[in-house]
């Protein structure tokens, strides 16, 4: 689910000759959840690899001060035939200052480039939390945020076409 509010007061206007720029002013954990429902039994070595289901969501919104908040939500659920091993959900946020980006390009910058900056930090948090839960660190593979964005835009267009 993606949401942008490019019309926020103080939203950047593309200035003549101004080079586009992104500054990360803050990064933070907005919400973190780790469930280990079958500990300690689930920590024993097993013959089969767990099934991993991943989820990725990006949201962005303009603030009254002209900055933008971007949230990256990552979730992972590991299961085996006998049930869930762990569930981790992280909502990781950042405050960004965007300069020199035309209004029509702002949404892709907020939902592709900004999450790309946040991802390595969120990935590390998930790896650390799963390791502290007694499992090997769960290292998320890199995410193609441009592909996720394109798929969401295509889905939105399809929904508009059916309306």
Curated annotation (Swiss-Prot):
Pfam families: SecB (PF02556). InterPro entries: SecB, SecB-like_sf. Gene3D superfamilies: SecB-like. It is found in: Cytoplasm. GO terms for molecular function: unfolded protein binding. It comes from the Bacteria. GO terms for cellular component: cytoplasm. Transmembrane segments: none annotated. GO terms for biological process: protein folding; protein tetramerization; protein transport. SUPFAM superfamilies: SecB-like. Keywords: Chaperone, Cytoplasm, Protein transport, Translocation, Transport. Homotetramer, a dimer of dimers. One homotetramer interacts with 1 SecA dimer. Belongs to the SecB family. One of the proteins required for the normal export of preproteins out of the cell cytoplasm. It is a molecular chaperone that binds to a subset of precursor proteins, maintaining them in a translocation-competent state. It also specifically binds to its receptor SecA. This is Protein-export protein SecB. It comes from Phenylobacterium zucineum (strain HLK1). The lineage of its organism: Bacteria, Pseudomonadati, Pseudomonadota, Alphaproteobacteria, Caulobacterales.
């Amino acid at each position: 689910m993606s949401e942008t509010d490019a019309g926020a007061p103080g939203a950047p206007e593309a200035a003549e000759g101004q080079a586009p720029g992104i500054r990360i002013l803050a990064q933070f954990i907005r919400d973190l959840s780790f469930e280990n429902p079958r500990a300690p039994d689930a920590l024993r070595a097993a013959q089969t690899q767990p099934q991993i289901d991943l989820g990725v969501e990006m949201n962005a919104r303009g603030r009254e001060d002209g900055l933008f908040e971007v949230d990256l939500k990552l979730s992972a659920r590991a299961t085996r035939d006998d049930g869930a091993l762990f569930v981790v959900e992280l909502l990781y946020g950042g405050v960004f200052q965007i300069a020199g980006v035309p209004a029509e390009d702002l949404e892709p910058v907020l939902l592709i480039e900004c999450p790309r900056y946040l991802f390595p930090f969120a990935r590390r948090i998930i790896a650390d939390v799963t390791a502290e839960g007694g499992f090997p660190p769960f290292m998320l593979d890199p995410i193609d945020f441009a592909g996720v964005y394109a798929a969401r835009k295509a889905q939105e267009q399809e929904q508009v076409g059916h309306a």
